[in-house]
From Swiss-Prot:
Disulfide bonding pattern of the chain: none
Cellular component, GO, one term: metallochaperone complex
SUPFAM superfamilies, per database record: ARM repeat
Protein name: MMS19 nucleotide excision repair protein
Tissue: Expressed in embryos (at protein level).
Gene symbol of the encoding locus: Mms19
Organism of origin: Drosophila melanogaster
Amino acid sequence: MTTPTRATLEKALKSDQKLVNSATQIAKDLTAKAYDISALAEALGFALSSPDMEERVAGTNLLSAVLIALPQDLLQERQLEFLSTFYMDRLRDHHNVMPAIIDGIDALVHMKALPRAQIPQILQSFFEHTTCQSQTRSDRTKLFHIFQYLTENFQDELQAMAGDFVYGLINSIDGERDPRNLDIIFSFMPEFLSTYPLLHLAEEMFEIFACYFPIDFNPSKQDPAAITRDELSKKLTNCLVANNEFAEGTVVLAIEKLESELLVAKLDSIELLHQAAVKFPPSVLEPHFDQIWQALKTETFPGNDNEEILKASLKALSALLERAAHIPDISHSYQSSILGVILPHLSDVNQRLFHPATGIALVCVSGDAPYAADKILNSFLLKLQAADASSEQRIKIYYIVSQVYKLSALRGSLQKLDTTIRESVQDDVIASLRLIEQEEFDAKKEDLELQKAALSVLNESAPLLNEKQRALIYKALVQLVSHPSIDIDFTTLTVSLGALQPVEVQSNFIDVCVRNFEIFSTFVKRKIYTNLLPLMPQIAFTQRILDLVMTQTFNDTTAEPVRLLALEALNKLLLLADQRFIVDVQQESNLLHKLIELGQKTEGLSMQSLEQIAGALSRITQQLPLSEQSAIVSEYLPGLNLSQSADLYITKGLLGYLHKDITLDDHFERLLTDLTQLSLNSDNEQLRVIAHHLLCSMVNKMESNPANLRKVKKITEQLKVAIKKGDVRAVEILAWVGKGLVVAGFDEAADVVGDLSDLLKHPSLSTAAALGFDIIAAEYPELDLPVVKFLYKQKLFHTIMGKMGSKLANYCVHHLKAFVYVLKATPQAVIKLNIEQLGPLLFKSLEEHNEAQSLCIALGICEKFVAQQDTYFQGHLAHLIPSCLELSKYKAQHTMQVRIAALQLLYDVTKYPTFVLLPHKVDVTLALAAALDDPKRLVRNTAVKARNAWYLVGAPSPN
């Protein structure tokens, strides 16, 4: 193929589309080596050197378009030198040619074989013959991308240009106002500023960025990919702290702008100081510390009314101190300046400045714990030792001291604290804790806040306590745990001391509790369990505590209330323990057999104790290997009589969380029959719930074979017979069986759903049938349903749509209620796909004023769509708004939850465009006035929020 003729090229230059098509074809020819690019340049010479400016623009555009379309590794070094020389020469051309030249240069600098020495020449020519800011916005964007690419890939060549490139870059950026271009600049310049020497131009470079601070920019709401003000501000801050030579200017700039009355300017200034503290070395910032501290002190001491400014200021101060911590001279200088201001105010907790002083004090500790903590603790110690120190003052001081210890520990400096000071503080704390040992101490009159505060200190200082102090603490802990009315949690302290001093804790605390356990009241025994069980993971105490629990659980002489406590403790123990521990206990003591025997043979066991036994059996069974689970079922299940309460609870424990791979086929029919009969005939609601859950779980886990399905079919037929006799309980049982089938994905689930939907028109069972759909759709965390069919909720939805679709059109109230229950469990995406069909049903359910549960569900579904500004609901606000206004009124059938949900939905509606809301504004604002007087505070709060939002519809934006 030959080089394109002049006629072909002239034709290509006539329109933009033809130019693009020709450039693509020429690029393919060049890639195929059909001809050389020099031949193309020669053929295109008539246009490139034409006296007609428009033709030169078109010719240059074609050449640049070809370069852009070429692979980056196609052209050779000699060809690229020739092209770069051409483009450098063209930089002198008319301004209209510049866009095409910029495109060509952009393509050239990305070519793999371009001699690296050409880069400085291209930049020199550009800076000499044109300016970036004289180009259009889109061309400036291309130029900034070029600068970004060059700074990242040609560092040595650009540094060889010395100040020429830096100066050219400064001129290119200076005056840029477009936020997208600024985003590009602020993104790549921090890396450039931190790696390139700025020479004598550091001040000029800093001023280029300083003029943008703080960012004052509001993105267009119509821009789908708008750059936010916060993003720009963050990137600008990174530029201002990118070079150590900017330190002085950055500090001055931040402090100057911190005086602004605008919140956003203050926050940006504080964040700039924070980033300066993080990025600049302490030696660079030290000369400016006094200025920074004075500025931050204004915002933190006595403190700014704005919580956001206060937190940001403390964060900046913390970063400043933490960075200086590894240079003792600088750190101590900083700390002395700050502590000199705040320490006098730590001595009086009633002073107005005490609270802000403590905040700054903790920041000092987080920065240089050994230095600051000693001085702060000593200041508190002087106050604690004063004769007029009250309990209220001690409480406040103790909580601050505990934070000082905690921060010191986090910084690894706890052991570095002055021994004399900390031991004196700890003595005072222990003395406060031991006040409970005094005979005149009346626990009923004391609020125990002092003791709680003392424990907070001891929790953090446990590693520092000496032997004498620990001995006193053990006595106090025994007194606390054995006190007949005091109940304070000190498990953190016992766990810490147990890890540090296991022998002492064993002899001075655990043994004392165990030895006297029998004589203590039930209240005290509960406290002992509470404080001993967290020590179980520590191997030194495991057996001792386990022996106590086992003895109290299985001793024949144990009273029922005490046994219940022991069973509760056993369950907590099994929850805390790992699998290996549980398996070991089972193997060593045959715990599972003991629990079953306890349930069956102990007279007078309460339902609560049986529930605890079932829970323990479940936790043990879950942790055992499948072979052992199967053996346990085979051993114990045949002998269980489900009509006995104890055996039912034991069955719950054994089967409730049995692994799904263990077959129950041999017992399946008997269990189904017994559980069904129990639920039909028992008046004990607790036993019926257990039966329902077991039925549901067993059906869910059953193996899908004809025999099992026949057994389930037999039970459902029995239930239908009972239903025909008007038995409400049979409807409930059918729903639970249906739930197990639905979740597992059995086809037979459709029959149960159909039966329930038919009952919705029954004169006496319709309510029970509607609640049956709630049972099927609701989530029950305590129910074990391990077989979960993929997308079963969607299948349930479509099944019910098929069964009830025609009936829903008639708007039977029970059909609506049942369908709302199903929608609660249906994924929102499925509802959205069917919203044209479901929308009228939702609106009708709101108008029917059903019972509270279904109303709350319907309102919740609507709210999810409205919060996302769904277009369907936008078109039906005329239906939605009146219903919500009616439901927001105080009426007997409108519970507090319904009224709040309706008002919240009305609030979310205000997110829709103003033109949609204006026709409703007056009516809604007037109607909501009644809700402002609702008897319930939470309803009134939501009403105020909703009414304010409607009142502001159409008001001018604050921006």
